[in-house]
Amino acid sequence: MIEDTDFEIFLYISKNKYQIFVFDKNYLKNLYNEEIKNIDEIELNTLSKFLDENIYKIEKMIKNFIRDIILIIEDDKVLDVGISLKKNNYDKDINQKYIKNTLVEIKDVFRENYQDQIIMHMIVVDNDNKNDDYLFLEVNFISITNNFTFYFDKLLESHQIMISRYMSGKYIKSYIGEDLAEISIMANKLNNGSNKNEVQLVSKNVKNTGFFEKFFQLFS
């Protein structure tokens, strides 16, 4: 039996194909990789059959149940929004706590203005605007609407599987191009903080004392 801490399951969804991976976190390679082509649309019946076939095969292979999955979505419904904030720095001391609090403010601005969106990625844009009098931060948010993800949540719930995270296929492919065999490898790296400018978000239900699981090293 393969322990569920030894692997990650990625499900890639686009209008052109569905693809499911079992990624070995110890050996950093795919143990399983299956796909099915689409005809320019996301069709839930086809996806349901694809999951029925492959979840059974995967659980038989790993001799364990799939409890959660990382969903990679590539679709024109994925939103990419930039928000910037400039704050006076009266103490003349910009430390990580100050930056963290500012990022929480920016995140709250996004939440207030895009209440129907799930944040997939929160990325701090590099800038050379260093000034002791103020802090300027520009952040890109990549998100997806709740209405779009609702059907995937319900579909996987029928298999007793929870979606642990949503990721953007376009964002991942910006690092690897169109080679989808590598998408699970890059998704694993990004999920573990390989982009030091990406803020790693965690649910408050997981940690009561922290909005950030890892803090990027942009200002260190």
Model-derived regions, located:
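Eukaryote-biased detector of low-complexity, proline/serine/threonine-rich segments
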Residues: 66-68
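Nucleotide/phosphate-binding catalytic cleft detector across ATP-hydrolyzing
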Residues: 1-13, 25-31, 35-64, 73-220
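Conserved blade-register residue in beta-propeller folds
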Residues: 20-22
